[in-house]
Amino acid sequence: SIRAVITHHGTKTGIGSEHIRPKAAFINPERFSTLPAIHISAGVCDMLSHICERYFSNTAATDFVDGQAEAALRTIVKFGPKVLADPSNYDAWCQIGLAGSFAHNGIFGLGREEDWACHAIEHEISGWNESIIHGCGLAVVMPAWMQQVCHVNPKRFADFARRVMGVGEDADDAAAAALGIEAFK
């Protein structure tokens, strides 16, 4: 990722630059099994947020990238609970590791305007209270944000409900969006 957060005396400042992109990242599922459950949960929530904050865009004609983002979201939704239930599940960690890499490398933002409102809100909250883990803060902010903005583009949220969360197939877009947000919680 080209992004970082600097925390200093109760404030958090986000920065972004190609100059801070790592030259290499080693994604070794054998190492993930030692993570505490709270950090597994927080990491999964951060992955979901990184994709959603690109996916929930009003930019048109992003079908290919949308499909890839939806596949990554489905993977994280499927395997996140599995690694939490069994941190030694190597195969599930392989899926999470790859999906997480794509979630953070910017590929799902290709050709679209991105919205980082949830991250901006969460940085303020955890800057004020440093005991709040970033991903845990996002787990609270994301569904609330979704509920507040889904009326702006109900079709996008209905697509998310149907294609990612597997709900709302027979509902109109507004109802499907509400079902998808509830399932996401």
What residue ranges belong to the model's regions?
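A glycine/threonine-rich phosphate-anchoring loop and its flanking beta-alpha core
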Residues: S1-F64, D159
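Active-site segments that bind and position negatively charged phosphate/pyrophosphate groups
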Residues: R54, N58-E182
